[in-house]
Amino acid sequence: MNNYWEKRTRANAQKAEKEAATYARRLNSTLHHAADEIDRYIADLLLDISSGGTPTRTQLWTAGKYLKLRDCIQQQCADVGQRQKDLLDELLPKLFDEILETNLADFKTADSFLPTRMIRQSLDTAWSGQNYSTRIWTNTNALAAKLEQDITDYIILGKSRA
């Protein structure tokens, strides 16, 4: 009997890892797309500026196109944050349905599964003093600030992200 539960636990852990890996791949694809979009915009900006001679740091900093670049970065960060939120919204209920609810079936009758209202309530419960949505936006804003600072540093110092 004990062997059955060990196999069951391992199978459920493998399901969770598979779902998490799928989520990670999809998020990684979104991040690469955003980075490529930003790189393309930076290349276009530098090409426009360099066609008039070698730009100085001051010229680059004060160029009106810098504002467009910053807007592009902010838009890409917002898009990445929204995509991450959408992927998590899709992943968490799926993991619950396939793993936790399956395990609960062994201990409860079929008509006593957690209702959708309780699942939603568990997602809305505060963790570390913040609810799910607030944590997503906190992480998104931190990512946006870091990305904006990195891009600015790359432009000023002439480095590439690779």
Name each model feature, range by range.
Residues 1-161:
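N-terminal leader/targeting and assembly helices and adjacent pre-domain segments
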